[in-house]
Curated annotation (Swiss-Prot):
Residue numbers binding Ca(2+): 440-441, 443, 459-460, 463, 555-556, 558, 574-575, 578, 602-603, 605, 621-622, 625
Domain (EGF-like): residue spans on this chain: 397-439, 440-481, 482-522, 523-553, 555-601, 602-637
GO CC annotation terms, alphabetical: cytoplasm; extracellular region; extracellular space
Protein name: Protein kinase C-binding protein NELL2
Laminin G-like domain ranges (all copies): 64-228
A GO MF label: protein kinase C binding
GO biological process: commissural neuron axon guidance; fertilization
Domain of life: Eukaryota
Length: 816
């Protein structure tokens, strides 16, 4: 309970504070009449008394005028309105009887982004707008506004939610496709007209405002109920969640692309480091490794054999190898018994009695080494070996390598009878005579390999390998043969492309009648495919149901061509690319909306009171009608009941709300028809008989500005039925059959939607946000959200009422 109170308090203080008790925030308000600076200098408009004296009111007269906001003023309006989904149109007006005119219009070229219109011809208020899918929409609200009386009108738009108030009474509340306020540059703002030639409003307007805020109707009618949160608040929350999901998907896609680019970085130049034996070296840095002089170049270690110097050594020294170094260095020597010994070398001397004495070269003198005793040997004396550098014998097969050796990498230590020596591994050669340092033999560079044609020799440490060139497959370790990807179907050509094998690869070329890069080919139709047709082969269009012809340019009249057999209780009505069976007079649909009209059932006029039989007759229901029967023996008057009033037999009258329809009572039956127009009669009603109006001022100009129509002429323009009536053009949406289905599509160049079973084909879906999708990364997606499929760059997926629909953009593929 407390949470609901807090939420309500929050909504009242923060959501409605700008309206209730605190006035309207000027940054959220567009006062149209004030900003347009209307005055005596404005042609066709003059100031008059209004409904109240608080603000100015203006009379829009029946004269040529151009009430249009300047470019700067219009842009100020649009900065407040652009990309907003919560706003209200407010106006106080008094419209001339029977006038059909535009209250305000925001449009760019022929695209009406927001237009409010009142038709006195058809007694309805219309809202024209464009949705986020860039389709035009018209919402019609039946209401008599053009009655020469004062009215307060407010139209609140909250995302996909519309509320129409008139005189502070909620008249209509609807859920529609969300209007788009993504207004492009060059959009114009008109008041009281659509443009210089059409939609002239006639009457008085006062307090014309646009409030960019929730439930702006409160400013006009403070006592109206408020709701919190609004539809736009809810849409905003869902949108934020979808945006976060989109950010996550885009981030994942960017990461995937970054990984791919990192794999291609070796094609780019950048400073690269080298690592050898745990040490990292920078670009161009050099160092000595054993008998090699190495340098880091572009991330690769390049080594050359070290050239050793040959220095002159001082007296009592000579050149000798030093542990851990490749080149010889000067080292102290000793002369003993006619031989030369280097510092640290030992030698044994045996006395005549067989006693062993050990000497070591130290400080240029052979010095006696004290004996520390020898370990006992476990081999017979015949297997014992005398050593030249030790008084202790060893057994045959002794492991000298385990004691100490100077063999470096790529060199192995080998045991001889009395010492250890170094030997280069297979595939390596010695860098000095003792084999302590060895280098790899590059069999590829020296031609010491066995790789045959169609292969490339790659050197490896101590060996080499033969790899196949691109487009070839391996036969054995040393040879490869040609690989025909076209024959083995190991190519990436489109099914509508031809594969041509080349040396080491293949080429893809689209077949005649198809366009693309070979890996993606699309059929090409020279004249295009109209009315939603699809080009499926060279100059072959697959036409949607209801159209025919090479380019699907011809509408099939299913009604006259006999393709459709409507039920006897229905009439066949042809539509562009479609048809429907409409219940005949005296019948109505039972709610099943069957395509052939089987759901049309008889209206029981007698039971529902929809008959005109007088009280002295008895109503008998008939199939598709009724009969007024006089009881036997009774003298009936033949009078009729119409709109609750008695009409005498033979009486003729004009309908109250339609002065152009004449009704008569004939023996209990009311028959109504349009007034017969006699253009020779000088008193003919030109409103009902506009075709009898000869005045040039009553002509109308077509929306394209090229065709002139006489009063009474009708035409179809952008899925709207238009009529010229005494110089005024009035247009209303073409009637479409009810579409009671979850998924529908509005084919190109058609005016009425059709039902489809596949949600991926649908462009209009009754979005149910409770239905979610689970994408390929197990991320929950809301209905309406879209994302780039993981691991791809050109596959766009969308969640449609729990169904995942994906499509590939061929142009995107070509740009990769």
């Amino acid at each position: 309970m407390e949470s609901r109170v807090l939420l309500r308090t929050f909504c009242l203080i923060f959501g409605l504070g700008a309206v209730w008790g605190l006035g309207v925030d000027p940054s959220l308000q567009i006062d149209v009449l004030t900003e347009l600076e209307l005055g005596e200098s404005t042609t066709g408009v003059r100031q008059v008394p209004g409904l109240h004296n608080g603000t100015k009111a203006f009379l829009f007269q029946d004269t040529p005028r151009s009430v249009k906001a300047s470019t700067a003023t219009a842009e100020q309006f649009f900065q407040k309105l652009r990309n907003k989904h919560e706003f209200t149109i407010l106006v106080t007006l008094k419209q001339t009887h029977l006038n059909s005119g535009v209250i305000l219009s925001i449009h760019h070229l022929d695209h009406r982004y927001l237009e409010l219109e009142s038709s006195g011809h058809r007694n309805e208020v219309r809202l024209h707008y464009r949705s986020g899918s860039h389709r035009p929409h018209t919402e019609v609200f039946p209401y008599i506004l053009a009655d020469d009386k004062w009215h307060k009108l407010s139209l609140a738009i909250s995302a996909s939610h519309l509320i129409l108030h008139i005189d502070c009474n909620k008249i209509y509340e609807r859920v529609v496709e969300k209007p788009s306020t993504d207004l492009p540059l060059g959009t114009t703002f008109w008041l009281g007209q659509r443009n210089n030639a059409h939609g002239y409003f006639k009457g008085i307007m006062q307090d014309v405002q646009l409030l960019v805020m929730p439930q702006g109707f409160i400013a006009q009618c403070p006592d109206l109920n408020r709701t919190c949160p609004t539809c736009n608040d809810f849409h905003g929350l869902v949108q934020k969640i979808m945006e976060l999901q989109d950010i996550l998907a885009k981030t994942s896609a960017k990461l995937s692309r970054a990984e791919q680019r990192m794999n291609r970085l070796d094609q780019c130049y950048c400073e690269r480091t080298c690592t050898m034996k745990g040490t990292t070296y920078r670009e161009f840095e050099s160092w000595i490794d054993g008998c090699k002089n190495c340098t880091c170049l572009n991330g690769t270690i390049q080594c050359e054999t070290l050239i050793c110097p040959n220095p002159d050594c001082p007296l009592n020294s000579a050149l000798a190898y030093v542990d851990g170094k490749c080149c010889k260095e000067c080292k102290s020597i000793c002369q003993f018994q006619g031989r030369t010994y280097f510092e640290g070398e030992r030698n044994t001397v045996y006395s005549s009695s067989g006693v062993c004495v050990l000497y070591e070269c130290k400080d240029q003198t052979m010095k006696l080494v004290e004996s520390s005793g020898c370990p006992a040997l476990d081999c017979p004396e015949s297997h014992q070996i005398t050593l030249s550098h030790s008084c202790c014998k060893v057994c045959k097969g002794y492991d000298f390598c385990s004691e100490r050796h100077n063999c470096m990498e790529n060199s192995v230590c080998r045991n001889l009878n009395d010492r250890a020596v170094c030997s280069c591994r297979d595939g390596f050669r010695a860098l000095r005579e003792d084999n302590a340092y060895c280098e790899d033999i590059d069999e590829c560079a020296e031609g010491r390999h066995y790789c045959r044609e169609n292969t490339m020799c790659v050197n490896t440490p101590g060996s080499f390998m033969c790899i196949c060139k691109t487009g070839y497959i391996r036969i054995d370790d040393y040879s490869c043969t040609e690989h025909d990807e076209c024959i083995t179907n190991q190519h990436n050509c489109d099914e509508n492309a031809l594969c041509f094998n080349t040396v080491g690869g293949h080429n893809c070329v689209c077949k005649p009648g198809y366009t693309g890069n070979g890996t993606t080919c699309k059929a090409f139709c020279k004249d295009g495919c109209r009315n939603g047709g699809a080009c499926i082969a060279a100059n072959v269009c697959a036409c949607p149901q209801g159209f025919t012809g090479p380019s699907c340019e011809t509408d099939i009249d299913e009604c006259s061509d006999g393709f459709v057999q409507c039920d006897s209780r229905a009439n066949c009505i042809n539509l562009p690319g479609w048809y429907h069976c409409e219940c005949r007079d005296g019948y109505h649909d039972n709610g099943m909306f069957s395509p052939s009209g089987e759901s049309c059932e008889d209206i029981d006029e007698c039971g529902t009171g929809r008959h005109s039989c007088a009280n002295d007759t008895i109503c008998f229901n008939l199939d598709g009608g009724y009969d007024c029967r006089c009881p036997h023996g009774k003298n009936c008057t033949g009078d009729c009941i119409h709109d609750g009033k008695v009409k005498h037999n033979g009486q003729i009258w004009v309908l109250e709300n339609d002065r152009c329809s004449v009704c008569s009572c004939q023996n209990g039956f009311v028959m109504c028809r349009r007034m017969v127009c006699d253009c020779e009669n000088p008193t003919v009603d030109l409103f009902c008989c506009p075709e009898c109006d000869p005045r040039l001022s009553s002509q109308c100009l077509h929306q394209n500005g090229e065709t002139l129509y006489n009063s009474g002429d009708t035409w179809v323009q952008n899925c709207q039925q238009c009529r010229c009536l005494q110089g005024e053009v009035d247009c209303w949406p073409l009637p479409c059959p009810d579409v009671e289905c979850e998924f529908s599509i509005l084919p190109e160049n058609e005016c009425c939607p059709r039902c489809v079973t596949d949600p991926c084909q649908a462009d209009t879906i009754r979005n149910d946000i409770t239905k979610t999708c689970l994408d390929e990364m197990n991320v929950v997606r809301f209905t309406g959200s879209s994302w780039i499929k993981h691991g791809t760059e050109c596959t766009l997926c969308q969640c449609k009422n729990g169904h995942i629909c994906c499509s590939v953009d061929p142009q995107c593929l070509q740009e990769l």
